[in-house]
Amino acid sequence: MKTDVLLKDLAAVFRWTARLNMHEGIANHFSIKLDQEDNNNNNNSFYINRPGQHFSKMKASDLLLVNENDIDMLRDRPDIIDPTAVNIHGTIHSKVKDANCILHCHSKYATILSTFADMTLPPIDQNTMRYFNRITYYDDF
């Protein structure tokens, strides 16, 4: 899929997330890894939202390209991008090759789940079965 289409789709995901009222807090970020053909086969470049941009107003042109070579510099520039976003998304995109799109938000239910000692979501009923084998846990962060 071409980069411009991916960016428009990701911007729509931001707006839909706001519509669903799942944009609580300021430290939420979504990213999309570039298609290798559009990225000179560089697997670790991705687009991500800038800090402070309201999800309901997101446009494709608001998304910031993070190149693998820029990650160290961007970690020291919170005015450009949230350093936690660079760390989280950069690490996941480089370690989990199938993670082409990462949606990191602090929804009420995910926040509650994160307070438990065991933060995994066991497939114990119909509601949780929809996530069975569809969630990746990265325990070394």
Where are these regions (language model features)?
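Glycine-rich flexible loops
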Residues: 1-141
